[in-house]
Amino acid sequence: MSKLKLHGFNNLTKSLSFCIYDICYAKTADDRDGYIAYIDEQYNANRLTEILTETCSIIGANILNIARQDYDPQGASVTILVSEEPVDPRDVDTSEHPGPLPSAVVAHLDKSHICVHTYPESHPEGGLCTFRADIEVSTCGVISPLKALNYLIHQLESDIVTMDYRVRGFTRDINGVKHFIDHKINSIQNFMSDDMKSLYHMMDVNVYQENIFHTKMMLKDFDLKHYLFNAKPEELSAEERERITHLLYKEMQEIYYGRNVPEV
């Protein structure tokens, strides 16, 4: 697509949303509590702020404001307001305090922001634990959130990823013609490295006429030792390893396809 000469600012909003899952098996209630505490500390508000700050650097956005919060008993949230235009570093506020009033921020928040929320959880009896991170990178202008794909998936050690990319609104060229998208895309996969794509099974569900693109990813290789918390495969019987492998694989399939799978 040739470069457009626009009339005024690029008014297209480009949003990339992730659900990233980490799956684990913890045998006892204490182990499950231990996993939740571990993952909660591993992805606390400070660590997530570091990840999102680097994301801003990757996509070429300028940070205006950071709001972050750890929650009791678990979970964290970080929201960063960004702009396309350079800002004076002396005007950037990253301290922890209440942000601007809604009247001062709502117009900007509708355009460009990066946010993440985390959701650790566990099965009450089955030993299965999951950690989900919801991430949204929404930009207005020429900045593309797709540049952050590989970095975010890698940083959050993802077993399963579901992604949505959508372009909303329109912008006008100098002749007054409306443009509802300003770049070529037929799949989110085209913006991933070959190394990343080789690690995952992938499936697309795209609605091209609406500029909506959806991709699901699940790790190809399954190694039980990477999914056990406070345990090693050699400490388990063959029957136990088979049972846990079945539980984990079923859990991953259900999350990947978004539906419960009945036992046969």
Curated annotation (Swiss-Prot):
Catalytic residues (UniProt): 112 (schiff-base intermediate with substrate), 117 (proton acceptor), 140 (proton donor)
Residues marked Cleavage (non-hydrolytic) (site): 111-112
- What does the record's cofactor remark say about binding? Binds 1 pyruvoyl group covalently per subunit.
Keywords associated with the record: Autocatalytic cleavage, Decarboxylase, Lyase, Polyamine biosynthesis, Pyruvate, S-adenosyl-L-methionine, Schiff base, Spermidine biosynthesis, Zymogen
Record keyword Disulfide bond present: no
Q: In which pathway does it act?
A: Amine and polyamine biosynthesis; S-adenosylmethioninamine biosynthesis; S-adenosylmethioninamine from S-adenosyl-L-methionine: step 1/1
Q: What quaternary structure, including any partners, is listed in this protein's UniProt entry?
A: Heterooctamer of four alpha and four beta chains arranged as a tetramer of alpha/beta heterodimers.
Q: Which family does it belong to?
A: Belongs to the prokaryotic AdoMetDC family. Type 2 subfamily.
Full protein name: S-adenosylmethionine decarboxylase proenzyme
